[in-house]
Amino acid sequence: PGTVRALALAHERYGKLPWATLFEPAITLAEQGFVISPRLATLLAKDPYLAGDPDARAYFYQADGTPKTAGTRLTNPALARVLRTLASDGPDAFYRGPLAEAMVAKVHAHPTNPGVLSAADLASYQAKLRDGLCFDYRQSEICGFPTPSSGTIALGQIFGMLESRDMAALKPVQGEQGQLAASSEAIHLYSEAARLAFADRNQYVADVVDVPVTGLLDKGYLAQRGHLIGNRSMGVAQP
């Protein structure tokens, strides 16, 4: 839900085109639709949850109850109407009024996983400018989004745990379809580092306050974590 405010802030500070103009390509795509690809059709056929949501079922399923197939044109007139409202009325229309009320009602009425989002949550939300989070990896500096996002912290931990490994020596191998694929050793090392990084993420990264970012990206700490990676799967990683 924060995306609209973030886009509005970016437009306010850096935009050149009128706000409403930015919505035109997305509105056109939502109204005219796109052709479902074989990959999307396969995902729809395998998804166990969409059919349980009336709105998702109406969007992704045919009248006979089967998922829409490859080659079918998928349109989204409801999304087009929302985008037209935002284009004409501005970002506040997303956080107050009918759209906000509909979002809150939908969250509360979810049949299996109802949420606690409130109208006050939406109305009070403000986008914030934050300094990027950067870390060193070999001869490079890599930067990404800081907290409350956890992605850059996790990536920095994975890279830090693997920095002592000669990853360049783990050359790609030929896949079954003739394509290049990562070697089993490279996959193992990355997977184990990711297990450890996500264990820390789940333990330490939540609200933006009091996240120990410096400690999580400390080279000495990551070297210790990296030593936990052996030749076999560690199973469930611990923070």
Model features per residue range: what roles?
Residues 167-239:
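Internal maturation/activation junctions in enzymes
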